[in-house]
Amino acid sequence: MGQSQSGGHGPGGGKKDDKDKKKKYEPPVPTRVGKKKKKTKGPDAASKPPLVTPHTQCRLKLLKLERIKDYLLMEEEFIRNQEQMKPLEEKQEEERSKVDDLRGTPMSVGTLEEIIDDNHAIVSTSVGSEHYVSILSFVDKDLLEPGCSVLLNHKVHAVIGVLMDDTDPLVTVMKLEKAPQETYADIGGLDNQIQEIKESVELPLTHPEYYEEMGIKPPKGVILYGPPGTGKTLLAKAVANQTSATFLRVVGSELIQKYLGDGPKLVRELFRVAEEHGPSIVFIDEIDAIGTKRYDSNSGGEREIQRTMLELLNQLDGFDSRGDVKVIMATNRIETLDPALIRPGRIDRKIEFPLPDEKTKKRIFQIHTSRMTLADDVTLDELIMAKDDLSGADIKAICTEAGLMALRERRMKVTNEDFKKSKENFLYKKTEGTPEGLYL
């Protein structure tokens, strides 16, 4: 029995055990999630660019950029259309402003009336209006003083600069740069008048110590009066030629200005320039244009003329001493002048210029005929001895007319007959030939 059981586990039972050993448990293969990963094929596959699939994202980006480009083109076209739709006036104004910015804007000139503080002032323009304006920060405040000329912005009138040379151009023109050619030798007669004007004007400028030793003050000014053509202006020219002083010549009518206050301002400028360039002589011809007697007037122009004369009175005899400034006035209507203008202290000497006498007439004829070619029969005694009221200018006109008569007949010498005819023609035109009031 025992052998039979053990025999049951013999060679047949060993085969079944081998089969059991081969059928061991193995876990299931895990399920793959996602795409199947491709196997790389070494370093060659790593160097190649990856394939992008699909192409949908790149195309969407391209379409988006194209749409943005279309929007930008539409905006550019819209702006261009808006520019073209602008009014022509606005476009021209914009272009004009650009040109002004490129070449600079003009500046107006005004007068500083009063300084309020460091940044504000009151200025006046040429039309007479006053403005409260600001002073820009770059303006030199040390140069600002009341009465100086300043540069103003043409829009807001702000002070943007200071004019260093604030001399009025009208006063600059009055100053004689070249001395006249006339001398005392060209004046016939008038010896007393020449002596008086030398004592009053020329000697105080050249030798003021003489008056200091005498203990007297030299005259401030003189007035030359007399009929027209007697040599008043000629004597003033001779004084300008004889002295080396600055000579300022002005006609009374030039001191009458259009705008209110310009006349007195011009008088102040005239004497200020004369004092700066001293010693100097101020010659005011035809002073009766502004120096007439004052009266109550309703006219604004007449009141302005009177204010100009009052400023002249102040300059002649004010608190400030004139120093080396001498004044010469000339008029042929001294009776119409205001007494305050020609009183002692302002005009200390009055020099009269009468019509020439026989001796003076002879001297004047000799001066005007010295350069003329005269015939042998010329005798001027008849012309000199005549009782006609001839002035120095009349004698010069007679000599000139005689020379023209000789030229008319193609002669190079002036005869005595030419002088007679020229005198007759001149006197006829002076007295009877020209109706009174023809040229008024």
Swiss-Prot record:
Return the Pfam families for the record: AAA, AAA_lid_3, Prot_ATP_ID_OB_C
| InterPro entries (UniProt xref) | 26S_Proteasome_ATPase, AAA+_ATPase, AAA_lid_3, ATPase_AAA_core, ATPase_AAA_CS, NA-bd_OB-fold, P-loop_NTPase, Prot_ATP_ID_OB_2nd
Q: Which organism is it from?
A: Gallus gallus
A single Gene Ontology biological process assigned to it is: proteasome-mediated ubiquitin-dependent protein catabolic process
List, as start-end ranges, the regions of compositional bias called Gly residues. 1-13
Compartmental location: Cytoplasm; Nucleus
Please list the disulfide bridges.
none
The record's section on Gene3D superfamilies has:
1.10.8.60, Nucleic acid-binding proteins, P-loop containing nucleotide triphosphate hydrolases
Keyword set for this entry? ATP-binding, Cytoplasm, Nucleotide-binding, Nucleus, Proteasome
Protein name per Swiss-Prot or TrEMBL = 26S proteasome regulatory subunit 4
